[in-house]
Amino acid sequence: MFRLLRWRLGRTLLRAAGRRCGGCTARLLPERAGDAGPGAERLRTRGAPARGHRVLPLLAALAWFSRTAAAEEQPGEDATDEAEAEIIQLLKRAKLSIMKDEPEAAELILHDALRLAYESDNKKAITYTYDLMANLAFIRGQLENAEQLFKATMSYLLGGGMKQEDNAIVEISLKLANIYAAQNKQEFALAGYEFCISTLEGKIEREKELAEDIMSEERANTYLLLGMCLDSCARYLLFSKQLSQAQRMYEKALQICQEIQGERHPQTIVLMSDLATALDAQGHFDDAYIYMQRASDLAREINHPELHMVLSNLAAILIHRERYTQAKEIYQEALKQAELKRDEFSVQHIREELAELSRKSRLLT
């Protein structure tokens, strides 16, 4: 049985939750150092053999949208007092350190910002700093610390009068659910996803009564957040081997992303591949091929940053459909792309898959 693997989680905040799980026919791709979460161990199910072709986990360095949960609480750029001006500069330095992959420096700067925020009793600065600290802990895999910091952020937001159905509260709740998923706390994870999805679906239903030109941007953000919640929940359901439910979640997420972002958006391509993986895990190889073929076509058109991984995914599904010659050609194309991007991890994986395909071809001749 050839193996099919999921993409790795999306960028920044979601990345710490670990690699996306393999389908039930597959073992997970070995983790890279530093990753955590449900994918940290290898899974083997349905008697999958020790070797076999699998879909690479994509880095998926893409976001549904980039706003942080407490963005609306960010201190103003036009600070009138010296303390707030200093806090703003510290926060800018911290974010720059995070972008430069200097987490230790960012953490020290954020602690200085938090101290100043408390000393000046600046509630917005306190909230925003907690949010940044929580996000930093999350991407570093410090899940227990991140959980407490996200809860502190939520407490300040709610204490400041923000409603429970506000997108910022739902986004933090999603991050908490992802933490519980990474910790294999199934009851808490599923309850968190259910809260996020039901809250946003109810909010969207109520907003349908508004005129089309009222708060259109806010409604679009709500739809995108719902898509992100569906995506995260589907990922966990697939990990939990609830395949048909995962498929339905991915179908809804893909529909939202296509409607709001468009078919050529990088995140849409990610979701097409994810849905294909869920279908493949259920043995629906022809349906999986349709989605993965479309994802690869679009990835080529837009020069997707993880094109080589999309192609590797496509090759694995072709093998499941016993299209070995075509699979070899796609793997070779994927290898060239991986070498161009100097992705040594993917290069090694694709070479292993080509070697396995050669062994299988010799057995069939």
Swiss-Prot record:
Pfam families hit by this protein: TPR_10, TPR_12
| Gene Ontology BP annotations | cell division; mitochondrial respiratory chain complex III assembly
Q: Where is the protein found, in the record's own terms? A: Mitochondrion inner membrane
Alphabetized PROSITE patterns for the sequence: TPR_REGION (PS50293)
| Annotated site location: Cleavage | A70, A71
Q: What does the sequence similarity comment in the record state about its family?
A: Belongs to the TTC19 family.
Would you tell me the protein name for this molecule? Answer: Tetratricopeptide repeat protein 19, mitochondrial
The organism is Rattus norvegicus
Phylogenetic classification of the source organism: Eukaryota, Metazoa, Chordata, Craniata, Vertebrata
